[in-house]
Every structure is written in structure tokens, then in C-alpha cells.
């Protein structure tokens, strides 16, 4: 073997150590043993020629030569294989090929038990452990178990706050590379996932799957407490907190807790004064996107009646107007079976009815009567003297004690 390390003298140039010797000692094992030896032997059908030399029968290439070259790249950080889609670089061409499957949505490795597909064979191996019930990787912080080391690594970033994947357009960071790829589509406008029913397109496959449930009516996430069901897993997780009372998102300024992260973000704007949603017509700003949308209707007159061509700024006004055409009166008074178009008319009728009813609560000082005890207590504040003579007992009483001794008219 002429090119077998040049008589064992080819070395890792940066560290000045013989590669095969260090491989035997167990050093550099992170990359040499786990990465090179394990994968090359499995993928390239490596055979051992002697105690130090391995050769790939498929490609007729010397194993130690490649091992030395790859070891050097780990120290020099040389990554000659570049992805044309996202500019990410790799040490091995095989890593680039696996990575490109993410962009091409190619998942050639399919699980025989659940037909779930994966873009890398190692991801499939980790997934298959979930069927076997094996989870080898445990988080030191919270004790959660994972079937793949990559899943554990991503999970640990939730504790450390590490977000190594940076968007070069807006400097936003992500803990997963797949989230970065999806985020980039917001800049490019790319929506590669299309619904076959309505041809609506989406930037992420999960969004497409959730959308398709609007056509099928499928609600796979069911609550075992109240039997409510949801199309989206995220909505299901939020709902479960209604039963558990869990509020995992705490405000650092006032320690108020919230069940949803979005509610915490909106709340924090109370402390910061941030109003990120700006109207381009009048430059007015809002803390919530919903408030901006409602405000924008004042400029566009979004809600228009087709019968009279009348426009409304507010959806609630538009709904009330439509009831005129439909002769719909949703507010019903149970005592007289009268129907009302507007809620405020309903409230007014309740007040009128109350005026004709018997007055139950009488104040013995001035003989005024009231429908409710709360109204009687409020009336007592009109009398500014601290003490009155009760006309029933002729004793001096302060207002607080006198309130309890006023009689209810039968």
C-alpha cells in the first residue's frame, strides 16, 4: 500500500500526530471512530487488509488516506462541500447529499411499522427505537428521554437558550435548522406545499397537513377530560392547560403568568410600551395585530351591505345592520317573551320592567325603596351625617350598623 499514510508517516498536520496510531489509542474517537470508521465500514464495505490498513472494496480507495484527510478537516474547519440552496458547508460529500434531501423534500428511508419517512438513515434508526420503547439519551437537566442524540441536542437548547441557526436576512435565530429553512421562505415567498383540493399553497408541510383537515374534518387531537378535539397539536396543548391550570410563561417584570407564549409577548408590551403594528394611513400604532386590522377598517370601510351599499367601519355594526334585513332579533326577555334587535334595547327593556315591579328594599330614614340591596347601600351615601335617629327605635345609629337593620318590604 503505497499511499497508506506514506509508510505510516502521513500525519494530522495541525496536531502532528499519526492518525492510525491515535485511532488505535482511542483518541480523536469523536470523529475518527464514530464518524469515519463506523460509517465507512457500514456504507463502503470496508475490509481490513492488515492491522492498520482498511480498504473500500466498492471504490478501491484507501481507508486510512480518507481518515487522515477528514481528521485534518476537523482541525482546520475545512468544509469543501457547499449546498447551493442555503450555502451551508460540509466536510463530507455524503453529508451534503443527506442535507440536500431537506430542500428536495426527499425522504427515502421509510419505517416499516408506521410508514413514516426520514431523510437520513440515522433518523430512521432513532425513530425505530420509539416502537421498541428504547430511549437511550437522557437530558441531565429535566430527565426527559429521547431516542436520538440529535433530538436530545435540540431539546437541551430549550434549557440553554442556544439558537445557532441565524437568518442572514433579518438576524432572527432558531434552535433547529429545519425551522430556519422554513423561516427563509417568508423572505423568498416560496410555498412549495400545495393542497390538491383547493390549490392553496403553504411554506411548511405541517401547515399543509393542518389545512387538509379542514377538508376532511379530521380532528386527531382529543382531550380526555372534556372530549374536545382539535386539528392542530399546538391548540390542543394550549387547551390542556385549561384543565391543569398550568401557566408556564412568566413575565419577568411583574411575574404574571400566562398559558400561551403569545399572550406573554403581548403583555410585555405594557411594560416596554412597544406598539409594533403601525397603520400606514395615519401612522397610528397598536400592541395587537387584531387592533390594527380593526382600525384599518376605519380607512377602508371594509364591511359593506349589498342591499343598501352602506359601509361600516366595525364588524359588529355591520352584523347589527344585517339583522334589519333578516328581521332577526336575537335578544329575548324571558319574562315577557319580547324580542330585541340590539343588546342595548334589551337592557333598556329590563330597566323599564324593573320600574314597574315591586320595590323590595326600604330605607327607614327617608322611606325610599329600592329593587336591590346594593342600590339601598349606595343610596345611604347620599346622607352625609354620620348619625341618624332611627324612627323605629329612636336610637342614634351610624350608617354601617343602620344598613343591617333596615327592613325589607314584603
Curated annotation (Swiss-Prot):
Its Gene Ontology cellular component terms are: centrosome; cytoplasm; cytosol; nucleoplasm; nucleus
Q: Which InterPro entries match?
A: Znf_C2H2_sf (IPR036236), Znf_C2H2_type (IPR013087)
Query: Could you tell me which residues carry Phosphoserine?
Result: 400
What molecular function does GO assign, one term?
A: cis-regulatory region sequence-specific DNA binding
Q: Where are the zinc fingers (C2H2-type)?
A: 81-103, 109-131, 137-159, 165-187, 193-215, 221-243, 249-271, 277-299, 303-325, 361-383
What GO terms describe the biological role, i.e. biological process, of this protein? positive regulation of stem cell population maintenance; regulation of DNA-templated transcription
Instruction: Keywords in alphabetical order, please.
Output: Activator, Cytoplasm, DNA-binding, Metal-binding, Nucleus, Phosphoprotein, Repeat, Transcription, Transcription regulation, Zinc, Zinc-finger
The compartments listed are:
Nucleus; Cytoplasm
- Signal sequence, renumbered to the chain: none
Assembly behavior:
Interacts with POU5F1.
Q: Which family does it belong to?
A: Belongs to the krueppel C2H2-type zinc-finger protein family.
User: What job does the chain carry out?
Assistant: Transcriptional activator. Important for maintenance of pluripotency in embryonic stem cells. Binds directly to the POU5F1 distal enhancer and the NANOG proximal promoter, and enhances expression of both genes. Can also bind to numerous other gene promoters and regulates expression of many other pluripotency factors, either directly or indirectly. Promotes inhibition of MAPK signaling during embryonic stem cell differentiation.
Q: What else is known?
A: Significantly enhances POU5F1/OCT4-SOX2-KLF4-MYC (OSKM) mediated reprogramming of mouse embryonic fibroblasts into induced pluripotent stem cells, and can also substitute for SOX2 in this process.
Protein name in UniProt: Zinc finger protein 322
Amino acid at each position: 500500500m503505497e499511499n497508506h499514510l506514506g509508510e505510516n508517516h502521513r500525519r494530522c498536520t495541525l496536531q502532528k500526530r499519526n492518525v492510525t496510531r491515535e485511532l488505535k489509542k482511542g483518541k480523536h474517537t469523536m470523529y475518527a471512530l464514530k464518524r469515519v470508521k463506523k460509517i465507512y465500514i457500514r456504507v463502503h464495505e470496508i475490509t481490513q487488509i492488515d492491522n492498520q490498513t482498511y480498504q473500500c472494496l466498492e471504490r478501491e480507495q484507501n481507508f486510512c488516506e480518507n481518515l487522515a484527510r477528514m481528521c485534518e478537516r476537523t482541525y482546520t474547519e475545512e468544509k469543501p462541500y457547499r449546498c447551493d440552496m442555503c450555502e451551508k458547508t460540509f466536510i463530507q460529500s455524503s453529508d451534503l447529499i443527506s442535507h440536500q434531501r431537506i430542500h428536495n423534500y426527499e425522504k427515502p428511508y421509510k419505517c416499516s411499522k408506521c410508514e413514516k419517512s426520514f431523510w437520513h438513515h440515522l433518523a430512521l434508526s432513532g425513530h425505530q427505537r420509539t416502537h421498541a420503547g428504547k430511549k437511550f439519551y437522557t437530558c441531565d437537566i429535566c430527565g426527559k428521554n429521547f431516542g436520538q442524540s440529535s433530538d436530545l441536542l435540540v431539546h437541551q437548547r430549550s434549557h440553554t437558550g442556544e439558537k445557532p441557526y441565524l437568518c442572514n436576512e433579518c438576524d432572527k435565530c432558531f434552535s433547529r435548522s429545519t425551522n430556519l429553512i422554513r423561516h427563509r421562505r417568508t423572505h423568498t415567498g416560496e410555498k412549495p406545499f400545495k393542497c390538491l383540493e383547493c390549490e392553496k399553497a403553504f411554506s411548511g408541510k405541517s401547515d399543509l397537513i393542518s389545512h387538509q383537515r379542514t377538508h376532511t374534518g379530521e380532528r386527531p387531537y382529543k382531550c380526555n377530560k372534556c372530549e374536545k378535539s382539535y386539528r392542530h397539536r399546538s391548540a390542543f396543548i394550549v387547551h390542556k392547560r385549561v384543565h391543569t391550570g398550568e401557566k408556564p410563561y412568566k413575565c419577568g417584570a411583574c411575574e404574571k403568568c400566562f398559558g400561551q407564549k403569545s399572550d406573554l409577548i403581548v403583555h410585555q408590551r405594557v411594560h416596554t410600551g412597544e406598539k409594533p403594528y403601525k397603520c400606514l394611513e395615519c401612522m397610528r400604532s397598536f400592541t395587537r395585530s387584531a387592533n390594527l386590522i380593526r382600525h384599518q377598517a376605519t380607512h377602508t370601510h371594509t364591511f359593506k351591505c349589498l342591499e343598501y351599499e352602506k359601509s361600516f367601519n366595525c364588524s359588529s355594526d355591520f352584523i347589527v345592520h344585517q339583522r334589519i334585513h333578516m328581521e332577526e332579533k336575537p335578544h329575548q326577555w324571558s319574562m315577557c317573551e319580547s324580542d330585541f334587535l340590539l343588546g342595548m334595547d334589551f337592557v333598556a327593556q329590563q330597566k323599564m320592567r324593573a320600574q314597574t315591579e315591586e320595590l323590595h328594599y326600604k330605607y327607614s330614614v327617608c322611606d325610599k325603596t329600592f329593587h336591590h340591596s346594593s342600590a339601598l347601600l349606595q343610596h345611604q351615601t347620599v346622607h352625609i351625617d354620620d348619625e341618624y335617629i332611627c324612627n323605629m327605635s329612636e336610637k342614634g345609629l351610624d350608617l354601617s350598623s343602620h344598613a343591617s337593620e333596615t327592613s325589607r318590604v314584603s
